[in-house]
Amino acid sequence: MEILETGNIPLSTNNPRGGINLHCNLENSAASQQSHHWMSGGRRLQFFYLAPASVLSLPTGRNFVKVITGRLDNIDRSCLAPPFSVRSTEVRPEKVSTGEETALIALMTLTENAPEILDDIAQLEFQGEECGELRWETFHERFGAFLDAFEGQDCHMANGFHLLNENDTEVAYVNPWVCGKGVDLSTHNHANDPSPMAPAFAEVHWVLASGTRTGGMYETSEPGSRERTLHPMILGQEHGPFYDRDMQGLPVFRKNGAVQYPWHGWQGGQDDSPGQRYDYVWAFEINPDYVEACI
């Protein structure tokens, strides 16, 4: 499959949670699909559904592929890295392909004018179809009504992409956010009661830009603890599950239906350079019914 000028995955903007719906034919295994593409921070960003025995030719440039569901056969990659580990998603072959399985993937291509350092949120404004639905706001603007931890902090979030199947069931929500130097995006464990506006999910993060190369995910015993295990992440890397898993490698649930996580968070890195250097991250909040097993 060659990349089209215009995508053929239908989109809509009527989701009560905001953002863009992408309506994928995940059960129609005979037909591959591709979304429109968006630009953000000099990165070309696009989603693809690959039917079995499909081949996707990648654009010219430096390419990174995040597998959301299924498997890419030629690069031996599925959705999840081993638990609490970090791996690169860079793809050096000119193509990716499926075997007997399908694959739902996100593709990031660094363009020639992609800045090495992202130091202004204006650089990250989305360009592309219905990009007004992907507006950035600060964490404080979004969460300040019930949380004061982000007041004065240089961190931002945009509405993202809801990847839906034929029945409009959400397979994954892709949530873009940005973290400035030294910012702690709060210690949390996703234990709140799930609801239609905040469903349960199995989460992994994909790094689109690493400001200082020292920021990353951390584990800790409780909020406020000084003891943390940090997992630094750089451009194009993703991490494996932080959530608890059963003997089959599937998510463990709390009594309220939320996926069970230990305390964790994202810590923005630090360096001696002047000015800001943002970490740019996409959180993949995957429907537990669609996440693969990971022992």
Residue ranges and their predicted role:
Residues 1-52, 90-93, 99-176:
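A short, N-terminal "cap"/entry segment at the start of jelly-roll beta-barrel domains
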Residues 100-123, 129, 205, 240, ...:
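A short hydrophobic beta-strand segment most commonly corresponding to one strand
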Residues 56, 65-70, 105-106, 174:
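Hydrophobic beta-strand residues in large extracellular and virion-surface proteins
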Residues 41-59, 175-200, 217-223, 240-247, ...:
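Conserved short histidine dyad/triad with adjacent acidic residue
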Residues 163-168, 196-198, 266-267, 273:
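Short, conserved, surface-exposed binding loops centered on an aromatic residue
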Residues 57-61, 98-101:
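Flexible, charged surface loops at secondary-structure boundaries
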Residues 62-74, 198-220:
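Short, conserved beta-strand element in jelly-roll/cupin
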Residues 47-50, 69-99, 219-269:
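Short acidic-glycine-tyrosine-enriched beta hairpin
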